[in-house]
Swiss-Prot record:
One MF term in the entry's GO annotations: phosphate:acyl-[acyl carrier protein] acyltransferase activity
Swiss-Prot/TrEMBL catalytic activity: a fatty acyl-[ACP] + phosphate = an acyl phosphate + holo-[ACP]
Family that this chain belongs to: Belongs to the PlsX family.
Residues in coiled coil: none
Alphabetized Pfam families for the sequence: FA_synthesis (PF02504)
Localization, UniProt: Cytoplasm
Protein name: Phosphate acyltransferase
Length: 333
């Protein structure tokens, strides 16, 4: 049975919502959850319900706060929940780590404890964005604001494997985020990256403009973390704005097609746009499965993040990335 170390103390709604998500995941997904954090607080929230033995507690008395410097904090707080949870993966006690706490602390813990996969210079945050045709894997979504062409090439290989193995997309289309479709468009980074991506074994389809991302122009969209994070936050803001506009128009639309149908349509759209539906974002490139959650995650988002972790382990993504990057070593900057 797959075991997942879950940082019970990380996030705006910890530990209550984290534990609720763990309980739901244990029952629905059939995974063993190791809740890592303050034992007394966790036991109080569990109230004796350990999902038929599928939930265990690993005591970790310290917590890394959102305002703390990530690297300094994990060095000083060896008994923090995120450090202990990541160490469980390193020791083989757990198969994956999931946290809604400090993203910086999770990245630092994953890098220092799990290490990088050979051939990966910089791990990348991969996230899913809804499109007209399904979803697109966007990476990097914020881990690396300054990149070189070889970094984007590594992101592309890892993103392609994630889309193929975890999302089940055969020969996923990989696009390079740019300001134009032509090969010569963009800055020095994108122009050089384009040339490098053409030489890889992935299904590279060329440049994709911002508007094409949400129209299903590619299955994977590659960019540096600065651009990726702007895209991610813009998409979140736009989704909230559109939902607000829909609600403003409900009164008028009720007279046309009826309240029940409207609410069904609105609910379906909201689910497609809700980050909680997609769970968490795997940190690709570290030597283990590490899934990053939104800081405001509640139970549903945590459950879905645990599902992402389970599927990533089951599909052997980390070994696949190792093998692929070993084969593509000849493509250098």
């Amino acid at each position: 049975m797959i075991k997942i170390a879950l940082d019970a103390m990380g996030g705006d709604h910890a530990p209550m919502e984290i534990i609720r998500g763990a309980r739901d995941a244990a029952q629905e997904l059939g995974v063993h959850i190791l809740l890592v954090g303050d034992q007394e607080k966790i036991q109080k929230e569990l109230d004796g319900d350990e999902a038929g033995g599928l939930i265990s507690i690993v005591h970790a008395p310290e917590v890394v706060g959102m305002e703390e410097h990530p690297v300094s904090a994990i060095r000083k707080k060896k008994n923090s929940s995120i450090v202990v949870a990541t160490q469980l993966v390193k020791e083989g006690v757990a198969d994956a780590v999931v946290s809604a706490g400090s993203t910086g602390a999770q990245m630092a813990s994953s890098l220092f404890i799990l290490g990088r996969i050979s051939g990966v210079d910089r791990p990348a945050i991969s996230t899913l964005l809804p499109t007209a045709k399904g979803v697109v894997v966007l990476l990097d979504a914020g881990a690396n604001v300054d990149c070189r062409p070889k970094h984007l090439k590594q992101f592309a290989v890892m993103g392609s494997l994630y889309a193929e193995r975890v999302l089940g997309l055969p020969s996923p289309k990989v696009g390079l985020v740019n300001i134009g479709a032509e090969e010569t468009k963009g800055n020095e980074l994108t122009i050089a990256s384009y040339q490098m991506l053409q030489k890889t074994s992935i299904n590279f389809v060329g440049n994709v403009e911002g508007r094409d991302l949400f129209l299903g122009g590619s299955d994977v969209a590659v960019c540096d973390g600065f651009v990726g994070n702007v895209i991610l936050k813009s998409a979140e803001g736009l989704a909230m704005s559109i939902l607000g506009m829909f609600k403003q128009e409900l009164g008028r639309l009720e007279d046309i097609i009826g309240n029940e149908r409207i609410m069904h349509m609105l609910g379906s759209f909201k689910r497609r746009m809700d980050y909680a539906e997609y769970g968490g974002a795997p940190l690709l490139g570290v030597n283990g499965v590490s899934v990053i959650c939104h800081g405001s995650s509640r139970a549903r988002a945590i459950k879905n993040a645990l599902r992402v972790a389970k599927e990533t382990v089951e599909q052997g993504l980390v070994p696949a990335i190792k093998e692929s990057l070993e084969n593509d070593k000849g493509v250098e900057e």
